[in-house]
């Protein structure tokens, strides 16, 4: 029976290679057998495959690879234990799988504060008697959502949230989807502190108004670091303008649903949990607070097996979550919404198809 172990390892190798060659998402894993722990050999092999998938390399200084491997093992154990419970969502080996939870939190420390909101709360989407909202909405199917983007290690989620909301609105109003420049916001919208501060989408919307629009991603591409504002580029060739912006009434998921039925909406969430860090698929209803520290965009909503959810676009590339998206439980018992998703919702306004 000496051939059994090599055969098993060959099967494991082929399974993991298949997973790594599949469309990008948080890495799926071969299940553990009967709840038993994985062997060190298996974990080391998965770690090497994960490193290859994410282009990870480590220096030998101060035992960095050993520390990262230990973090990876801890996260893999956490994933296996969670997925064995058959809860409403699954975890996987995201790009953060070699980090401790504290390192993950420190990577994007920005914290948009609801008290910093501009006084732009509107009753535009407050529910009215007789309202009949669609049971489900998915702006991706309407061609109003560009491909998933990646903010890298720059704390620029606010810029990606702003841009995605404006891209979607422009498609709805003009019929044209244009990928816009987050880098212009990072470099030129100084009040939001680029990669280093707690940017707000409202402030970025106001910048677009003052700046007479925003350039395309093609003409002002993303660099992942904060640079000097290219004033020449920033004041010419504007491809999209907006007229105003408004805030959804805070702590009101029904108003938020009505807003999303009309357009993609920028939101803030609390992303600090290990479950959020390692989210892979299905409807997330896991632990999280309401101390907002990350900006995303709701691009739709729906229901599945009696559970309502939001379709939320992230800016961590396609190897996190469900190809870059997360479904967050909707109509949560707390009016702030799960992870505070109803606390800081806002959207741009465009009154005509002209971008002049």
Curated annotation (Swiss-Prot):
| EC category | hydrolase
Q: Where are the transmembrane segments?
A: none
User: Which positions are cleaved off as the propeptide during maturation?
Assistant: 27-132
Q: Which Gene3D superfamilies match?
A: Cysteine proteinases (3.90.70.10)
Give the intrachain disulfide bonds: 154-195, 188-229, 288-339
Q: Which UniProt keywords apply?
A: Disulfide bond, Glycoprotein, Hydrolase, Protease, Signal, Thiol protease, Zymogen
Name of the protein in its database record: Probable cysteine protease RDL6
> In the UniProt record, what gene is named as encoding this protein?
RDL6
């Amino acid at each position: 029976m000496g051939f059994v172990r090599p055969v098993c390892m060959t099967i494991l190798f082929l399974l993991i290679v298949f997973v790594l060659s599949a469309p990008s998402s948080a890495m799926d894993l071969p299940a553990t057998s009967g709840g038993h722990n994985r062997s060190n050999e298996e974990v080391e092999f998965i770690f090497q495959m994960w490193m290859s998938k994410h282009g990870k390399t480590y220096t030998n200084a101060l035992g960095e690879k050993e520390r990262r491997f230990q973090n990876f093992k801890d996260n893999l154990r956490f994933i296996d234990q969670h997925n064995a419970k058959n809860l409403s969502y699954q975890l996987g080996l995201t790009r953060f799988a070699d980090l401790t939870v504290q390192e993950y939190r420190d990577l994007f420390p920005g914290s948009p504060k609801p008290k910093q909101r501009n006084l732009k709360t509107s009753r535009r989407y407050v529910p009215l008697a007789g309202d009949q909202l669609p049971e489900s909405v998915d702006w991706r199917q309407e061609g109003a959502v560009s491909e998933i983007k990646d903010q890298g290690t720059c704390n620029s989620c606010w810029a990606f949230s702003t841009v995605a909301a404006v891209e979607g609105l422009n498609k709805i109003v003009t019929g044209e989807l244009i990928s816009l420049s987050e880098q212009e916001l990072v470099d030129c919208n100084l009040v939001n502190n680029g990669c280093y501060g707690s940017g707000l989408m409202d402030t970025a919307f106001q910048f677009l108004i003052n700046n007479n629009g925003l350039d395309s991603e093609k003409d002002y591409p993303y660099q992942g670091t904060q640079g000097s504002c290219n004033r020449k580029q920033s004041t010419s060739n504007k491809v999209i303008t907006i007229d105003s912006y408004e805030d959804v009434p805070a702590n009101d998921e029904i108003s938020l649903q009505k807003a999303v039925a009309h357009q993609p909406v920028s939101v803030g969430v609390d992303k600090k949990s290990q479950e959020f860090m390692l989210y892979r698929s299905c409807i997330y209803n896991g632990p999280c607070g309401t101390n907002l520290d990350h900006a995303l965009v709701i691009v739709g909503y729906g229901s599945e097996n009696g559970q309502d959810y939001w379709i939320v676009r992230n800016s961590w590339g396609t190897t996190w979550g469900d190809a870059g998206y997360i479904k967050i439980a909707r109509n949560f018992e707390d009016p702030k919404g799960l992870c505070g998703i109803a606390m800081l919702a806002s959207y741009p306004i465009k009154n005509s198809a002209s971008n002049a």
